[in-house]
Design a protein with these regions (language model features):
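A short, Trp-centered hydrophobic/proline-enriched beta-strand micro-motif
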Residues: 20-29
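A short core secondary-structure module
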Residues: 55-100
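Short Gly/Pro-enriched turn/cap motifs at secondary-structure boundaries
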Residues: 33-36, 60-63, 79-80, 106-113
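Short beta-alpha junctions and helix-cap segments that line functional grooves
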Residues: 13, 41, 57-59, 101-105
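Glycine-rich beta->alpha junctions and the first turn(s) of the following alpha-helix
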Residues: 88, 98-196
């Protein structure tokens, strides 16, 4: 929103996001058949009069059930080359036709809900287009680059915390009359965890 939204859109959404009025925002790019290759998305937005009509589904959307607004990418020119003809939109939570599925049951990161977001004849105002028509894929790619830095930092932090917990555990747990930290096999495992 900060990068490409109009001034009106920024004034409408940024204060709500920054103040906590909106607990989160949703980044709706990934689809079940277009994850690693989001340019192959199928979600469509068709202009009908002064409204965009959106149909499709987005998968693995972080904090969707808490989002006040969604940044959505959809195909607006199906005849364009791959990666072209995709536009970016702002869709408010509670818009009729916007359906948030129950949270996925994940192996980890339970404090961060992940949901499917379905758009079933979801109608949004024409001025919900963010940035230029058919130029939204460039926006998505540039935003993903910054997000990867955050994911890398998060992953490193989780890994280091896991090693800290493991080190604490092996120094407390005893077997055969000694701390398991004294066993060479355990030491190898911790060394591998540190170096990997």
């Amino acid at each position: 929103i900060e990068s490409v939204a109009s001034e009106e859109q920024k004034q409408k959404y940024l204060p709500k996001l920054c103040s906590g009025e909106y607990a989160a925002g949703g980044f709706c790019l990934t689809e079940s058949g277009a994850g690693s290759d989001p340019s192959g998305m199928k979600t469509k937005a068709v202009l009908e009069g002064d409204e965009w009509v959106i149909n499709g589904a987005k998968q693995f959307i972080t904090s969707a059930e808490y989002a006040g607004v969604f940044v959505l990418w959809a195909v607006t020119d199906p005849d364009a080359k791959r990666g072209k003809g995709i536009s970016c939109f702002l869709v408010e939570a509670g818009t009729p036709g916007l359906i948030i599925s129950p949270a996925e049951k994940k192996m980890g990161q339970h404090a961060s809900a992940t949901n499917e977001v379905v758009f079933d004849n979801c109608r949004i105002p024409k001025d919900s287009l963010m940035g230029s028509l058919n130029q939204g894929f460039k926006v998505a790619v540039s935003e993903l680059a910054g997000g990867r830095i955050g994911i890398g930092s998060l992953s490193l932090g989780i890994g280091l915390a896991a090693i800290d917990y493991a080190r604490e555990y092996v120094n407390e747990r005893e077997q055969f009359g000694q701390k398991i930290a004294n066993f060479q096999g355990i030491q190898w495992m911790l060394a591998d965890a540190y170096t990997d």
